[in-house]
């Protein structure tokens, strides 16, 4: 291994609160070699992001202090240099890529100018030179028309292109180290793979070092040279990725590896297929469904208005007790379809029949039955719950509206619902702010069960959760569908989860169903090129299964061909 460009020794960060001191980082030590990608993994709250912010002295609160330890950047201790020197280090020597580019790009400043600003500050170029350099960087990070796109604003780009712009801003100062803090968490699987390949190509061409923060072991297995595992502010273990993944020493690392959803493998059990004696009458039947929206055209929707086919000719059947997964990228129509099923989005044409009632022909009666018999679990567990109500009050409210449980029996039913979702009964007295994301999602599932539904629609309900919590929620769904004969429509962009949970998989692309079938068959022998592309883009925890495996999803020249980087001395 080459010499360390960054060496952290016994770094300790404490929070000084009115109630006393609290250790947030506990004597963390690690090394980053030149040209190396180090994966920093762990659940939310493990200290990953705080560690990286501590490296550049950007602690999120004045109550937090670096108490001891050292951060050596090529021999210089960053904990001891002046604030003026630290300003030059940030961006100039250590660049940062954040999780949500929308929050970190200036919404009223052109993309090109945001890159040029850093170039002028750190490299001392004039406006014309900085503009030329910024255009070159836009091309390097994959913008197809960098000259014209220089003038565009962040809101004019997709999430993936905004993340490319964020990488461009970080590269503008030619740093020695890039810190990428969950740079792909909010992105679709294919866009995620493109960003990861871009980071690897940048490393190869520029010779810089990267710290990649993530909670997904599949990502680090595919992209990183070494892995460091954190929990509770401590570094539990680190080492070469193959050694750590094949011979983990710490029980927590073992749990992380076991919790990672597996992709097609003969040794991994898949979801059970529907039973032969399943009723012939479908619970939900969708026939040639179309949902169209008019966009643009100004206040009066004039000649400039365009029609978007959000859902186009979708036909689908769900049998009682069946678990069906719908997968696809953002904009594929998954969530629009879910909202249409629940009557939250008007239908342009087609039919939705729920338990024998056609919602188009008997809308009032159909919606009344649907609201009684169907429920939804949302993506963001915090925003989906009323912050003013305790969990018990929230469940009581639903039970009263539902009207099936006598008032005297409601407290007992609340306790039963909490038991069903694996929460202790004392959670009835707690509000969402005092609960973790996984606990809030369990409460959201309890609320859905409170209506005693036949159908549950789960819309990206585990996307915001850590991998171990994801595994717990998936197992909860599996148990509930088995115990209660629930029909589950599970919407996700994570194919590995769908493959492990769902009996059937439906693949949507641009509003249409492009493939449908038993999960085992879809994943083992995909028929549509788009399905094959989605599967190829999933980072597998086995480092020998290469990302994309020869599949080019970009439809553009490879990143390696468009990155004329100069290697740093």
PLM regions with names:
Residues 3-4, 21, 144-151, 241-290, ...:
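Short catalytic/signature loops enriched in Gly
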Residues 65-77, 350-358:
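Conserved ABC transporter NBD signature motif
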Residues 77, 129-148, 358, 409-426, ...:
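Conserved ABC ATPase "signature" region
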Residues 78-95, 121, 242-248, 300-305, ...:
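ABC ATPase NBD coupling module
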Residues 152-157, 161, 431-435, 439:
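Conserved ABC ATPase signature
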Residues 174, 452:
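Conserved catalytic motifs of ABC-family nucleotide-binding domains
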